[in-house]
A protein has these predicted regions:
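N-terminal secretory signal peptides
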Residues: 1-17
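N-terminal secretory/targeting leader peptides
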Residues: 2, 21-132, 140-141, 147-348
Length: 348
């Protein structure tokens, strides 16, 4: 909550459990030096949490933006970052930011449990590249989503942060066509859209919070998972997976959201400065991800993953035949769907 001294990173870290102890401890150590800088006597202290490793490009650019905010406001606004699920899983933090216990949160697919239309940019195979993605989320589609986010007591900042196109990793077989997905135990985020898509393709999807995925893969609770290459690398999934199939089945990004009641305690000029600098950080992070994606495949091959390129058309046809697109067109509504197709082209 704003204007209260944030809980120390050390105290928060003691709440992590299981495999989280390994990943979060590493993140907390990095967070202490990279993300934990704070002013001694700021007028407004804000807590910002996310479930991403401290080394992820989002956390690096967020830390830079928070430093810039502190400087631009002459130390009046101090945002302390808690990466790596130090404040709980994504579902927990979404509840916290709604209640005001957390001030700012970078939220991805779990937002769809409250605002279903927030998942629409992630419709399977909607965008072949980033040009279409940024045109949509920086344009009318993003504006529509931000307006909906405002109905649950949150403020969504203008620029989405990039998570990337998602790829499938498995421990038992590569995925070359839809038949290879039949019966696969696949971890998916806590999101109805993801569960619906992979069920339509014949998998056995299991919704698991990100911080628990490594353990689920290690103990064979699931055979595989799907995430962008940056997260596959940062979370070290290559240690417990053998194959990476470049399906590029969904793009996903993160909204930077703030508790409206808390955020409006800041004077307008400080709010505008905070939003402007965090938006700038988002745009820089998009460029970071584009650069990183050029080298990640080579790096992950060196770490033991075997890659295969996938023809996406059979997957799209299978989803269309299963009624996936028609189902979600009905759920999102005609206005939102037509807005999406202005950027993606016809999907259903």
């Amino acid at each position: 909550m704003i204007s209260r001294r944030a809980v120390s990173g050390r105290a928060v870290l003691t709440r992590t459990v299981s495999r989280r102890t390994v990943l979060a401890a590493a993140g907390a150590i990095a967070g202490t030096s990279v993300l934990g800088r704070r002013a001694q006597a700021a007028e407004f202290n804000l807590k910002y949490g996310n479930d991403l490793p401290a080394t992820h490009p989002i956390n690096k650019r967020a830390a830079e933006a928070c430093d810039a905010i502190r400087a631009a406001t002459n130390g009046r606004v101090d945002i302390q970052i808690f990466p790596n699920s130090q404040l709980g899983g994504s579902t927990d933090m979404l509840s916290q930011v709604r209640s005001g216990a957390l001030d700012i949160f970078t939220v991805g697919s779990p937002l769809a449990n409250l605002i279903p239309v927030s998942a629409i940019p992630s419709i399977a195979f909607a965008f072949p590249n980033f040009d279409g993605v940024w045109a949509a989320v920086d344009g009318d589609l993003g504006a529509h989503i931000r307006q909906q986010v405002g109905t649950i007591g949150l403020v969504a900042f203008d620029k989405m942060w990039d998570n990337g196109f998602r790829q499938i990793t498995t421990s038992n077989r590569p995925i070359n066509d839809p038949n290879d997905l039949k019966g696969l135990k696949l971890r998916v985020p806590v999101s109805p859209l993801f569960t619906s898509m992979f069920r339509a393709l014949g998998t056995s999807p299991t919704a698991i919070n990100f911080v628990e995925v490594y353990t689920a893969l290690q103990t064979k609770v699931v055979d595989g998972q799907e995430n962008p290459l940056a997260l596959i690398d940062a979370a070290k999934f290559y240690e417990v997976q053998k194959f990476c199939s470049l399906t590029g089945h969904m793009w996903e990004g993160f909204w930077m959201v703030a508790n409206r009641r808390n955020f409006e305690q800041l004077p307008q000029d400080l709010r505008e400065t905070t939003v402007r600098l965090l938006n700038q950080g988002a745009v820089k992070q998009r460029d970071d991800m584009a650069t990183l994606n050029v080298t990640l495949e080579t790096q992950l091959k060196q770490k033991g993953l075997t890659f295969n390129i996938v023809n996406k058309k059979p997957f799209q046809e299978a989803l269309k035949a299963a009624g996936f697109y028609a189902e979600w067109r009905g759920k999102f509504g005609e206005d939102a769907w037509k807005t999406l197709e202005r950027y993606s082209g016809a999907l259903s």
